[in-house]
C-alpha cells in the first residue's frame, strides 16, 4: 500500500491537499500515510484518480472556477457510502469521511460536514 500512496503524490491535487494540511495541522509521517491510504481507498472505491475527482467537481469559467453542484452532490453521496463500508467503529468511519472531505475542501470543493461522531452522553 505504501507504493500506491507514494504514487498518489504525483497528482497535483494530492500535493495541494497535503501541503495545505501540513500548514494547518503539522501531520506526523504516520498521519500523512494514513491520509494517503484513506484517499487511495476512496479513489479505488469510486474508480477515479484524485485529479479527475477535483476536475469533475470544478468548472473553468471566465470569472474563475465554479463548483459543479451535481458532481459535488455525487461525491458527497459517494463519501457517505464509502464510510458505511469501512470496517471498524463509527468513529473510524467518520474519520475516513473527514479525511476524504478534507481532500475535496482543500482543493476548492466546499462540502457539508457529513457524519458527526459524538460519544454517548455528549450533548450539543
Task: Tell where the protein language model's regions lie, with residue ranges.
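N-terminal core-binding DNA-recognition domain of tyrosine recombinases/integrases
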Residues: 16-30, 36-123
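Acidic, low-complexity proline/glycine-rich segments
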Residues: 1-11
